[in-house]
Design a protein with these regions (language model features):
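A short helix/loop element that forms part of the nucleotide-sugar donor recognition site in Leloir-type
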Residues: 74, 177-190
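Nucleotide-activated donor-binding/catalytic signature segment of Leloir-type glycosyltransferases, i.e.
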Residues: 239-289
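A short, histidine- and acid-enriched strand-loop-helix "catalytic/donor-clamping" loop
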Residues: 65, 92-96, 110-127, 142
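Short alpha-helical donor nucleotide-sugar binding micro-motif in glycosyltransferases
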Residues: 293-298
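A short, active-site helix/loop in glycosyltransferases that binds the activated sugar's phosphate group
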Residues: 126, 133-176, 181
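Short hydrophobic beta-strand element within catalytic cores of glycosyltransferases
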Residues: 323-326, 333-337, 343
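Conserved donor-binding/catalytic core segment of Leloir-type glycosyltransferases
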Residues: 142-144, 190-207, 213-220, 230-231
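Aromatic "clamp/platform" in nucleotide-sugar-dependent glycosyltransferases that forms part
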Residues: 306
């Protein structure tokens, strides 16, 4: 099959959308299919093919609510006129989906859409946009959701739409088959007996790093511990991973200047942690290989993100055999049930679906899990076994292939 994937961003850009589409596209290429990705032109992309996947760039941006800009007609003409057997459009609220609304009826190949959560469903500015959504969805041959209950699938169900599948996210069997060879703890000066809490996400303060830090400030363990706060690598804007001579690793100044709102609380938490014996914080911008190694080298993954759909990091934590503790954001509770690799910490959810956890509540859950080594071992083992059995990208890609072929 000749398959076109449409997504706002793609490699070398980082993010969940990019990761999912790259994994699915590359797996399908390995199965003998042809895959092309239509995406935004970005600085630093010096290729038009990556691992067998053709990349077609367009200078377009925005969405129907904020406004579309760029060579929109070029993109529409490409999608309509090229001879693809199937098209997969990832995510609403962005140009690769919104630009095609007027021409969906002209696309004659099999059309598949992944709504991706509808993060702005409850925002007043998007009311008109989502009033039109049911009619737009009905023009697709098939829909793919990541959760059995969430904003996007609930909207589809409420309008009688039944042509869909629930296909979970996953983690790479190539990245997580075995722990990386280099010693992460040794490289960053972390002692073998230290209990390591890990959190990963970008942008930092939307992914709950402040709440995790404030919770860690309150955690009391009988053994030394380390909290690793990792953001995505970005050599143009952030420094490399810091060395480990001090207890507190500071954010690059450029980042701090752009996030003043939570910085006062964040700095206060860091100062308080610094005064406590046996506790350290490591703030990093690790490259991908080191992130994978951190998953294998840590003791508990802690996730306090404010808004998500189906967080990849929870599948990756399970794949590494690393127990996770997450707030009930997106379908985190469903992922915990599917993988049996983690637990959910209670947290409040506002009218727009944003989750906020009380640091003292999160701290107590972190303490409870860190103190129960047998339960941690059980969660880690169950998570890894279930990932191997059901949630590797190879198995997920096979489910996509069946949808693409209409079988």
């Amino acid at each position: 099959m000749r398959i076109l994937f449409c997504c706002e961003f793609y490699a070398p850009s980082f993010g969940g959308v990019q990761k999912v589409i790259q994994e699915i596209a590359e797996h399908l290429v390995r199965k003998g299919h042809s895959a092309t990705v239509a995406t935004t032109k970005v600085k630093g992309r010096n290729f038009d093919e990556l691992n067998g996947v053709r990349v077609k760039e367009f200078e377009v941006s925005g969405n129907l609510v904020c406004g579309l800009e760029g060579d929109i007609e070029h993109y529409k003409k490409f999608v309509v006129s090229e001879q693809f057997d199937a098209i997969v459009i990832k995510a609403a609220q962005q140009w690769t989906f919104d630009c095609l609304w007027p021409v969906l009826s002209q696309i004659t190949c099999r059309k598949i859409h992944i709504p991706c959560g509808y993060s702005r469903l409850h925002e007043p500015a998007y009311q008109g946009y989502y009033q039109q959504m049911p009619d737009v969805l009905r023009q697709f041959d098939w829909l793919i959701f990541y959760a059995t209950t969430y904003r996007d699938i609930d909207l589809a169900k409420s309008h009688g739409i039944t042509n869909y599948s629930v296909i979970p996210n996953g983690a790479s069997e190539f990245e997580f088959a075995e722990p990386p060879r280099f010693d992460f703890r040794k490289k960053y000066g972390i002692r073998e007996g230290d209990f390591v809490f890990l959190t990963v996400g970008h942008p930092r303060f939307q992914k709950g790093q402040l709440e995790v830090t404030q919770a860690y400030e309150r955690v009391k363990l009988s053994t030394p511990s380390v909290l690793i706060l990792n953001d995505r690598p970005n050599p143009d804007r952030f420094s490399k991973s810091m060395t480990f001579p001090d207890k507190i690793r500071r954010f690059p100044r450029a980042f701090m200047n752009r996030h003043r709102y939570p910085l006062r609380d964040f700095r206060r938490a860091l100062r308080n942690i610094r005064r406590q014996d046996g506790k350290e914080v490591l703030v990093t911008n690790l490259e991908r290989q080191e992130v994978v190694s951190a998953f294998f080298s840590s003791d508990l993954f802690v996730f306090a993100s404010h808004v998500e759909y189906s967080p990849l990091v929870l599948f990756e934590s399970a794949a590494a055999g690393l127990p996770f503790l997450s707030v009930p954001v997106g379908n985190a509770g469903e992922i915990a049930a599917w993988t049996q690799g983690g637990e959910i910490c209670p947290a409040e959810c506002d009218e727009r679906g944003n989750v906020r956890v009380e640091p003292k509540v999160l701290a107590q859950k972190m303490e409870d899990l860190a103190s129960d080594t047998n339960h941690l071992r059980y969660l880690g083992e169950k998570g890894r076994v279930n990932w191997k059995d059901k949630y590797s990208w190879g198995k997920i890609a096979a489910a996509y292939e069946r949808v693409l072929m209409g079988s």
